[in-house]
């Protein structure tokens, strides 16, 4: 305070971070009173994280967030179907300004190009080990793809965390962990920038600032996956913490397809006061004109400014076309399934709930990225970094995607097992990868095809059977697989033995 007390940016003070000790509350409460009496030009609290003292000017609390320590797969982002209409108003106290403590902590796969940047006494031996084990598993060529795909999921998780804070009325702010990686504590790859504050290539400042800025458009979507019998309705609001209110903001919203075809648009003129929870109108779009599975983008912006934000949503046909020549569908790799393969037939094997723990059944798959890192959290779930796939693979032709996790994958991955494919042929690649924790670097699959005996086998570890009327994206994923398998395009080239398939399952051959 002696040195920096007159600095114009010095407006908040805590003693430090996450204290311990039985007398922390009484000691730090006394410290708050002391400094409030000594210099009342700033806001004081006890510490970052805890404890919460009644005499503090604000609280820095760990609980207003979409994933907290120990929540694992029970967190908002993993346990609740995707939406953007939740906030933290029931968690925070309205009579005490609350700043959330260390939101984020979303991991990304290592960037092995970073190794060359360590030219001093510090060497990136951790990254070298991770790179070596990936090479041992025959996936060295996928490292940049894993980085990009997991990075896009990481960006989505940060966007969800930050927007939830901005939607919360009366919220005082958030403390983000982090913009750049922290190489310690087990290797916490939680930044969109590397430890040298340089880009990793999957998101730039322009995109990040659409949802983290002085002024941010927000839309409260009740869901992110829709049917074409629905009408999209979602309230638009703003968080505005600029220097002054905005008079008669020229607000425009539009709904477009991935090839930039306009479905509908609207305009609103509204004054924006300082604050958040500023309601301005709604997005309204009937979806019955969409007969094919479609990804849409909803964009809200203020004309003649750089202020804008956007979200992807998905629309699927409520009525699915009949499959002309469906494959044999089974949950058992038994004599019947083998006989059909021996006779040159097509088989879809659904393995959800039957994957051996040693072959992936024990891997905790979630929608979100890994929290902080599994080494430091003692294996907290999830253990994966989203999916990676070839977005143009014909098996996914009726399941629009961009090759990485977005909200349409939540239905699929929130009820799936990982399948460890390390003992498959070295060059074998699943159609849909689950990106493994870099500490283990296993070849994990969610969906793969193989030539088995004389037949054609498709194996999927997601639940594609239960409550599909409540899980439209899972139903559409199943439909896409079946359409592919009933076509001439389904022609697996990689041969796998029946014994290799059997080893994936809990009790081998059933």
Q: Could you say what each language-model-derived stretch is?
A:
Residues 229-271, 280-286, 292-303:
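Beta-strand-rich binding/interaction modules
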Residues 1-193:
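Substrate-binding/catalytic cleft of secreted carbohydrate-active enzymes
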Residues 303-309:
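Short, exposed coil/turn segments at beta-strand boundaries within extracellular/luminal domains
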Residues 38, 80-81, 353-358, 373-472, ...:
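Catalytic beta-strand/loop cores that center a nucleophilic Ser/Cys/Thr
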Residues 326-373, 454-455, 460, 481-484:
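Short alpha-beta junction capping motif
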Residues 38, 177-242, 251, 509:
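Aromatic-rich peripheral "rim/lid" segments of glycoside hydrolase catalytic domains that contact
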Residues 20, 51-52, 104-107, 180-182, ...:
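Short, solvent-exposed loop/turn segments at secondary-structure junctions
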Residues 314-332:
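Low-complexity, Pro/Ser/Thr- and charge-rich linker/hinge segments at domain boundaries
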């Amino acid at each position: 305070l002696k040195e920096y007390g007159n600095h114009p940016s010095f407006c908040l003070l805590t003693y430090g971070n996450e204290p311990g000790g039985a007398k922390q509350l009484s000691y730090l409460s006394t410290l708050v009173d002391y400094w409030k009496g000594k210099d009342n030009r700033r806001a004081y609290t006890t510490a970052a994280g805890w404890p919460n003292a009644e005499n503090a000017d604000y609280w820095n609390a760990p609980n207003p967030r979409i994933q907290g320590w120990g929540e694992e797969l029970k967190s908002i982002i993993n346990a609740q179907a995707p939406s953007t209409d939740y906030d933290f108003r029931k968690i925070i106290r309205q009579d005490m300004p609350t700043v959330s403590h260390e939101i984020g902590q979303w991991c990304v796969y290592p960037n092995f190009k970073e190794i060359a940047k360590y030219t001093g006494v510090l060497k990136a031996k951790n990254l070298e080990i991770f790179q070596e084990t990936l090479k041992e598993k025959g996936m060295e060529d996928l490292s940049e793809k894993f980085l990009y795909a997991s990075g896009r999921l990481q960006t989505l998780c940060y966007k969800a965390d930050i927007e939830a804070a901005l939607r919360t009325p009366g919220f005082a702010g958030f403390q983000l962990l982090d913009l750049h990686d922290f190489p310690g504590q087990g290797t916490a790859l939680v930044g969109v920038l590397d430890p040298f504050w340089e880009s990793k290539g999957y998101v730039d400042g322009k995109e990040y600032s659409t949802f983290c800025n002085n002024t941010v458009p927000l839309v409260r979507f009740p869901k992110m996956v829709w049917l074409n019998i629905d009408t999209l309705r979602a309230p638009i609001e703003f968080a505005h913490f600029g220097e002054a209110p905005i008079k008669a903001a020229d607000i425009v919203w539009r709904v477009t397809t991935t090839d930039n075809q306009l479905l509908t648009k609207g305009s609103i003129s509204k004054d924006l006061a300082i604050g958040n929870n500023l309601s301005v109108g709604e997005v309204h779009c009937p979806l019955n004109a969409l007969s094919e599975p479609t990804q849409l983008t909803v964009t809200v912006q203020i004309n003649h400014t750089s202020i804008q934000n956007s979200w992807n949503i998905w629309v699927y046909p409520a009525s699915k076309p009949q499959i002309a020549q469906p494959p044999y569908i089974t949950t058992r790799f038994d004599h019947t399934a083998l006989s059909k393969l021996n006779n040159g037939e097509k088989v879809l094997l659904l393995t959800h709930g039957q994957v051996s723990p040693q072959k992936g059944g024990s891997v905790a798959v979630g929608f979100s990225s890994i929290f902080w890192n599994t080494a430091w959290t003692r294996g907290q779930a999830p253990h994966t970094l989203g999916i990676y796939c070839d977005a143009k693979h014909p098996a996914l032709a009726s399941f629009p995607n961009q090759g990485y996790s977005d909200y349409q994958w939540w239905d699929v991955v929130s009820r799936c097992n990982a399948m460890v494919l390390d003992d498959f042929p070295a060059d074998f690649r699943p159609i849909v990868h689950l990106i493994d924790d870099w500490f283990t670097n296993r070849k994990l699959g969610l969906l793969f095809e193989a030539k088995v005996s004389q037949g054609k086998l498709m194996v999927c570890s997601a639940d594609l059977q239960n409550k599909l009327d409540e899980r439209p994206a899972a139903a559409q994923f199943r439909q896409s697989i079946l359409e592919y398998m009933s076509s001439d395009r389904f022609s697996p080239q990689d041969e796998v033995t029946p014994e290799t398939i059997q080893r994936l399952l809990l009790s081998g051959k059933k």
